[in-house]
C-alpha cells in the first residue's frame, strides 16, 4: 500500500515536471582557489516556463555541468511567476525593467511580429509562451542581469482587470476610455 502511494506521488511529480519547458541561458566555468591549487566547478542559468503564462529562472552551481543544470532547473521551478498576456500572445502595454546596469524595454507587438529579442530575453519569452513582442536591452549584456531585468519588467506589467480593480472601475469602462484616447484602434479584441 505504501509503495503504491509512493509510486503515485512520483508519477504526479513527473507529470508536473513534464508540463514545463526549460532553456539553458548561460553556463560558466568558475574556480575556487584552495591550498592545493584551483578547484573548478560550473554555474548554470536556466529559464523554465509552461508556455501558458508562467515562467521562472534559477541559478545552480556544482562540480559537474548536468548537476548544475539540474539545481538551476529546480530553483527556477520554485520561483515561478504568472504573467498576464493579451490574447495569450503579447503584453498588455509597454514596460521597462532594470537590474544592476542592465535595462530592458519590452513593447507589445501586433500579431505576426514574432519574438524580436536578443539572447537571454528570447529564452524568457519562448518559455513564457509569448508569441509577439519587441524587446531592447540597454547597458549591461550580462545574462544574469538581463534575465533579472526582464523579470522586473514582467512583474511591472498589469492586466486591464487589475488596473480596473485598483481604480474602482469596470473593465469595459477602462476599455472605452482607451478607445476614446486612441481613435486608430477601434477593435474590441485589441484591449482584451
Curated annotation (Swiss-Prot):
Annotated TM spans: none
User: What NCBIfam families does the entry give?
Assistant: rpsE_bact
Q: Does the keyword Ribonucleoprotein apply?
A: yes
Show the domain comment: The N-terminal domain interacts with the head of the 30S subunit; the C-terminal domain interacts with the body and contacts protein S4. The interaction surface between S4 and S5 is involved in control of translational fidelity.
Entries under InterPro entries matching the protein: Ribosomal_Su5_D2-typ_SF (IPR020568), Ribosomal_uS5 (IPR000851), Ribosomal_uS5_bac-type (IPR005712), Ribosomal_uS5_C (IPR005324), Ribosomal_uS5_N (IPR013810), Ribosomal_uS5_N_CS (IPR018192), Ribsml_uS5_D2-typ_fold_subgr (IPR014721)
What is this protein's function per UniProt? With S4 and S12 plays an important role in translational accuracy. Located at the back of the 30S subunit body where it stabilizes the conformation of the head with respect to the body.
Protein name, per record? Small ribosomal subunit protein uS5
Residue ranges constituting the S5 DRBM domain according to the UniProt record: 20-83
Species per Swiss-Prot/TrEMBL record: Methylorubrum populi (strain ATCC BAA-705 / NCIMB 13946 / BJ001) (Methylobacterium populi)
Provide the assembly information: Part of the 30S ribosomal subunit. Contacts proteins S4 and S8.
Mind telling me which GO cellular component terms the entry cites?
small ribosomal subunit
Please provide the Gene Ontology terms (biological process) for this protein.
translation
| One of the record's GO molecular function terms | rRNA binding
Under HAMAP family, the record lists: Ribosomal_uS5_B
Record keywords: Ribonucleoprotein, Ribosomal protein, RNA-binding, rRNA-binding
Q: Does the keyword Membrane apply?
A: no
Q: Where is this region: Disordered?
A: 162-192
A Pfam family for this UniProt protein? Answer: Ribosomal_S5
The family line of this record is:
Belongs to the universal ribosomal protein uS5 family.
Amino acid at each position: 500500500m505504501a509503495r503504491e502511494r509512493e509510486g503515485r506521488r512520483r508519477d504526479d511529480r513527473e507529470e508536473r515536471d513534464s508540463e514545463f519547458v526549460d532553456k539553458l541561458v548561460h553556463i560558466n566555468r568558475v574556480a575556487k582557489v584552495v591550498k592545493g591549487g584551483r578547484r573548478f566547478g560550473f554555474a548554470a542559468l536556466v529559464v523554465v516556463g509552461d508556455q501558458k503564462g508562467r515562467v521562472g529562472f534559477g541559478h545552480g552551481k556544482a562540480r559537474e555541468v548536468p548537476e548544475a543544470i539540474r539545481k538551476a532547473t529546480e530553483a527556477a521551478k520554485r520561483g515561478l511567476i504568472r504573467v498576464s498576456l493579451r490574447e495569450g500572445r503579447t503584453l498588455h502595454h509597454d514596460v521597462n525593467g532594470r537590474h544592476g546596469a542592465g535595462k530592458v524595454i519590452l513593447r507589445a507587438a501586433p500579431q505576426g511580429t514574432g519574438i524580436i529579442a536578443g539572447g537571454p530575453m528570447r529564452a524568457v519569452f519562448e518559455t513564457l509562451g509569448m508569441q509577439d513582442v519587441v524587446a531592447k536591452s540597454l547597458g549591461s549584456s550580462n545574462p544574469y542581469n538581463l534575465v533579472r531585468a526582464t523579470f522586473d519588467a514582467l512583474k511591472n506589467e498589469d492586466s486591464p482587470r487589475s488596473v480596473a480593480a485598483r481604480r474602482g472601475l469596470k473593465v469595459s469602462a477602462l476599455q472605452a476610455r482607451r478607445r476614446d484616447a486612441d481613435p486608430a484602434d477601434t477593435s474590441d479584441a485589441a484591449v482584451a
